[in-house]
Amino acid sequence: MESDLEFSNIVSVLKLVEATTQRTVMAKALSSLLAKTPPQVIDKVIYFLLGSLRPDWEGVELGLAERLTLRAISMATGLPIRQVEELYKKLGDAGEVAKRAAEIKRSKGGGGTIFDFIDTGPKRRLTISKVYDTLMAIAKASGEGAQDTKVKLLSSLLTDAEPDEAKYITRFVIGRLRLGVADMTILDALSDAFDVNRDLLEKAYHVYPDLGKIAKTLAEGGEEAVKAIKVTPGVPIQPMLAERLSSPKEILNKLGGVAICEFKYDGERMQIHKLKDGTVKIFSRRMEDITNQYPDVAEYAREAIDAEEFIVEGEGVAIDPDTGEFKPFQELMHRKRKHNIKEAIEEYPINLYLFDVMYVNGQDLTDLPLPDRKKVLFSIIKPHEHVHHADWIITDDADSLEKFFLDAISSGCEGVMCKSVKLGSVYEMGARGWLWIKYKRDYKSELSDTMDLVVVGAFWGRGKRAGTYGALLLAAYDPDSDQFYTVCKVGSGFTDEDLKKLPQMLEPYKIPHRHPRVVSKMEPDIWFTPGLVLEITGAEITMSPLHTCCSVMLKGDVGLAIRFPRFTGRYRTDKRPEDATTVKEIFEMYSNQKKVKLTDQVP
Ligand code: ATP
């Protein structure tokens, strides 16, 4: 048993995490669990806690529909399928059904009684390896008869499971573990459990976002082994992010007087990898493998980039085939529907605008300054109808920057990205820093920018909105404390269609109490695990005693809130909750807004 861990240990932690509203309790439970986990299985424990068999970018899916899990529950417990389906109707959660069915089986003497336990002894107790390996076998079953194999494998696992174990295994299978245990939470727990510097782990995570691998490397090889984790084609790296400012002068000042400025295209960010064996993979901003949606772009990259192995980055933009003009971001949504990719490729062609290179033929370029990376990038792009370098200038003049910005806007772009060219202008993985600064059109409208906020609660609607949500409680992210702070209650901007689908979209995130990573003074009618990210605009940012956002910075009992918040209609499914606008950004927007007001008053 020493090289394995009884699954019940994980279940105890899951129960605790599910019940608590305190982040410290959750963090302590996770770190104690990891501290006592044998190195051989620490990766499996972490994948289970995160609710995913492998890191998301590997795209491993169990492929077992909820209906089939009910069949497995019926097989494992001997309850007739009709009874299991009735339980499902009543309880509405396959996990609870699995638990209830196992309890019924136990009450009928069908296993799990005290005698059973003595009979078969500890042999029958599930371990994490048994659970994980079986789930992996379920994911791998393919071809004819795969569904039956999957159901049988699951039912064999559930047969050996205690009621609570059955509940969490089933939730995992249907993708509803959703405990709000995020990558950052695990990094904290690892750093605490192994008493290692968190920055070291975070750095490795930026280079190789696979917490199972990082944990195992740490547990088996110590800090040195973690430091040796390298950029690897085929494994996405955490994208570099930009800060924002609202005037060319400020931007040039911040960047040391001169900058490379590029169009900020309104499409989908693509990190494109070519491996030695010729495979091309495309990863999204949140590092999901989106190659299947863009086989055309993968082919263009293969044709247009002259290197055996590479990692480059660019924006894929939908183009009007008749005019060659850019189409808005929403057009790319047609690519998300899995079935008619071929048609979508014809109807919605895409151009790729490259703006960075991070790796070429065995060499990690992320530590090179931007001008050096650009040289490499220009040297490997061959002329191609659909692949170009992003439109760019290098300038030290605010008027030229403003003119370039207006050009970008009139070409249908969102604005410009201004990038540092100084010696230290490395590719900063996973960081939102001042080496890249975005300057967008909507900076000049009401609020200085839209914000991407996380839904953490909802209030029932009345009148016309009876039966659906009247408003949502939204929060910003604080990476330092790994918590979400509320910043507004938003009820406007939702279409009838939005209102109809929101309860459905949010159903999987529903929890009975405030999530331990949410800091809120408000008490909504429904709480959610932070998951869904929405784009919000508003009139201004004001102080508010009702919200908790930035209350730490304001050092008082007041926080910051968005006045007249409105949903822009954009669901940011390309962002994880941890990619939402941060409290620090909101504080900066608030401070800038104050500055603008003061200068407005100068005669
Ligand atoms: P936003 O919410 O403004 O779209 P974001 O939060 O997704 O931005 P940011 O770092 O704020 O990410 O802005 C950078 C985004 O702009 C990138 O993710 C990328 O998709 C897009 N982009 C378009 N053109 C460029 C460019 N030339 N250089 C870098 N990023 C670009």
UniProtKB/Swiss-Prot annotation:
GO terms for molecular function: ATP binding; DNA binding; DNA ligase (ATP) activity; metal ion binding. DNA ligase that seals nicks in double-stranded DNA during DNA replication, DNA recombination and DNA repair. This is DNA ligase. It comes from Caldivirga maquilingensis (strain ATCC 700844 / DSM 13496 / JCM 10307 / IC-167). It comes from the Archaea. The lineage of its organism: Archaea, Thermoproteota, Thermoprotei, Thermoproteales, Thermoproteaceae. It holds the Pfam family DNA_ligase_A_M. HAMAP family: DNA_ligase (MF_00407). It catalyses: ATP + (deoxyribonucleotide)n-3'-hydroxyl + 5'-phospho-(deoxyribonucleotide)m = (deoxyribonucleotide)n+m + AMP + diphosphate. One of its GO terms (biological process) is cell division. The active site is at K264. ATP binds at E262, R269, R285, E315, F355, R432, K438.
